[in-house]
Amino acid sequence: MTDLTLKALAAERQVSVDRLVQQFADAGIRKSADDSVSAQEKQTLLAHLNREAVSGPDKLTLQRKTRSTLNIPGTGGKSKSVQIEVRKKRTFVKRDPQEAERLAAEEQAQREAEEQARREAEEQAKREAQQKAEREAAEQAKREAAEKAKREAAEKDKVSNQQTDDMTKTAQAEKARRENEAAELKRKAEEEARRKLEEEARRVAEEARRMAEENKWTATPEPVEDTSDYHVTTSQHARQAEDENDREVEGGRGRGRNAKAARPAKKGKHAESKADREEARAAVRGGKGGKRKGSSLQQGFQKPAQAVNRDVVIGETITVGELANKMAVKGSQVIKAMMKLGAMATINQVIDQETAQLVAEEMGHKVILRRENELEEAVMSDRDTGAAAEPRAPVVTIMGHVDHGKTSLLDYIRSTKVASGEAGGITQHIGAYHVETDNGMITFLDTPGHAAFTSMRARGAQATDIVVLVVAADDGVMPQTIEAIQHAKAAGVPVVVAVNKIDKPEADPDRVKNELSQYGILPEEWGGESQFVHVSAKAGTGIDELLDAILLQAEVLELKAVRKGMASGAVIESFLDKGRGPVATVLVREGTLHKGDIVLCGFEYGRVRAMRNELGQEVLEAGPSIPVEILGLSGVPAAGDEVTVVRDEKKAREVALYRQGKFREVKLARQQKSKLENMFVNMTEGEVHEVNIVLKADVQGSVEAISDSLLKLSTDEVKVKIIGSGVGGITETDATLAAASNAILVGFNVRADASARKVIESESLDLRYYSVIYNLIDEVKAAMSGMLSPELKQQIIGLAEVRDVFKSPKFGAIAGCMVTEGTIKRHNPIRVLRDNVVIYEGELESLRRFKDDVNEVRNGMECGIGVKNYNDVRVGDMIEVFEIIEIQRTIA
């Protein structure tokens, strides 16, 4: 047989060459990959490998199977049996003796190190306690020495002042006694310090011993375990199903339930829990055997011995049920507490923060008020706004009747001042534009009707500075002209009158002045405050004078705005464009709006992706009083929404989502406003209240008669204010005006049209129809009477004469009285009269008759009266009992 090379032998044995070289080296034979291997060397290697296999670590593998049957109820009342087999496998490895010795040596070294550390910790604790005791003893000695020196100085002064030897002896005795006391105190302090030292050392030793025990148990070696579960254990639902099946089976057994032999207990944790459940069911059935051991499944809840005071977090609005859940009480208890406070509510009713705070504090809980708009306030406050205010251009809204040349006037101003020199005029009209004049810039709002004007004012945003009222010189004042006057007056905005069509032959400017003077618009030449400018939109006459009049009025108003910093403004109009998405026309009021800014606009937010001016040109920024069209919002905002530039887009999104969620609550809350029955709820002390009314009637005579009658109802406390009035049906403009002014809509022999009803329903306005003028006057008078503060009156209900005075340890002086008039009632306010002069006013605390507490004593009976916090009651005094009643005032 020829010798093989080592490489060929490795290929034959299917091992690597390096591995085979290492095995030869372990057997004591040095070989390389190209060396030949003889038969003798093969035998030597085989013997070496066999010895290694025999001397290897021993392994022991244990396998265990557990079989059980699970009954699962099926459809139709039948149960199905499922066989469950749980397999477990464990492998134990015998350690090498040398490895065991090494581990034992390491454990011994670790225990010695822990013991050394424990001894060092004990010694360190003893040293620290000793030093602490010495410091305390030294400080105590210093304090006692100082006290002793102070006492000696005091004693010395006292001895120097004393002249007799007897007093000197007394002082010396006192001094000796105090020294003894000081010594006793010092001894007690040393004992206390020694006791603390011993306790500290004992505690440290116990802690070190406990740590050593824990380390000992942690360091204990455990056999190497390889556990494999081949099946998932029974789930909780399966155990519940098994319990339900057992109950059904046991319920069907009428006899022999107790006589049945117990099944052998299963082993394992699942069997143990099943046994516990069986025991619990047996205890419930109340079988024989007397007192049973409590099952682990029985709940151990104990009712609290006293009320638990909680920290209740209350938002701006909360329902009664939510408040009860936060306080962990039943809703009926909260309703009872509210009834005690004088408020009726159902469990689903929304209450405000103040009411919820009163109820929670009344029930003994601590209230934490949380403002839900904290994030919104934080976002709004974290804005970089400039400090220096500069003059800004006025914002002008042009109003007037539809046929009076308002559109022509706007077109002429745009064609001459905005797009001069540009072929084709304006490329795009966005509802607002600004013009440059020699004296300054003016911004015009071109809004259809008065929608944006009133919606902004309803939201508290004063976007318009001046109103230009366009009146045709040949037509005079028309219904929409009157509506525009009412809107301007309600907003408190100055009016500049443009008398249009002055070039017509039938033009009569004086007639326009006379008609407008009836509505409070007086020209300056008549002593009024309104400027009248004669213009012609067709011929172009008077346009420059109109612009100068607007700038003059703006100069009087002294309009200023901050130009630098983050911008804020209002939405003039908005729409959804098919190619560009949500588009909003924004009028900047303060700061500068840049392209790329993050804006928060009502319920919407976004980054300004593009800005265009009224000419359709791309712009990068816009200052105060400049209208621009912005793209990039998440949705279409509403006209009149506030536009604010913020820093963080994520926070802007959170605020927008919060506003969307809050909108429903605000809408529900708005349903309670401007109701005649709830007018008195809005009453505030010290203010003159107003009942705002928008009146529409069938004829002008009815309007004047009703207006005069309502205005005559005004008093010093409640005023009737006619916000708007007119002839004809109730229109959408009337409803919008009522919503912006928080007014009541009154229709006399007229009705509201479809668009007005839609606004009335969405804004939850109070609309009332009348056909008899007396009913209208009476209901408004009742509403005004409800706004009057009630009158308080004191009514005497009883009088008692003091016949004798007794002393009571609980109430002090008790007056024995005879009731001479009326009835004496307990806990009522009283007055004590002596010689018909009031000497005390307080409250009746105790009322008894024949040692029994009573609530009232009638005329001709004797009783004992205890006056709260008053004991100077004398025989012959008169006790007067009265009650305070509220008299509701009415308007005559």
UniProtKB/Swiss-Prot annotation:
Polar residues bias spans: 68-82
Binding site for GTP: 400-407, 446-450, 500-503
Region G1, annotated ranges: 400-407
G4: region residues: 500-503
One Pfam family linked to the record: GTP_EFTU_D2
Cellular component GO terms held in the UniProt record: cytosol
KW Cytoplasm (keyword) present: yes
PANTHER family assigned: TR-TYPE G DOMAIN-CONTAINING PROTEIN (PTHR43381:SF5), TRANSLATION INITIATION FACTOR IF-2-RELATED (PTHR43381)
HAMAP family reported for this sequence: IF_2_B (MF_00100_B)
Name by which UniProt lists this protein: Translation initiation factor IF-2
Record organism: Salmonella typhi
